[in-house]
Amino acid sequence: ENARACREAVQGSKRSREAQAGETSPAQSLAAWHEFAGQYFPALVDRPAVVHGGGVLLPVPFPQTNLHVLRAGVFVGSVQKGRFVPEHHLFTAFGAQCANCEQLTLADPRTTEYLSGREVEARTAADGWCCVTVDGWPLGGGKVSGGRVKNHYPKALRLL
């Protein structure tokens, strides 16, 4: 059942990326990514990025073999309504490099709240996008506004 929910979430996000692909040029997508990365992920600004399927991908060098590669890189986000919107993959892969983090602990009740898809109080992150970490490990992302972390944890992964 969880596998089905994950497939549906991936297919749904793929459909939304494909629908938005015609709205933004690759150059605009890369410019939006570089602006976003400069603010929240400065260590990633100089990494090569490519636009694929309406989204921005940070490719990983991979040797040419006969292996079928599902994803040779990290899908970091896409441009929606003129703004760069980060994906969950960005925060889980590069969360340790995020300049704005909401730090939780395993014993913190906000951890369960976040994993359940609810907003949590922001204690360590400033306004804007942030990586939510638990004991230093990246869990996902959110957007801080008015002292609250607006939850962007994927619905298919949430606790019920």
Tell me the role of every PLM-derived stretch.
Residues 3-160:
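Polybasic, low-complexity RNA-engagement segments
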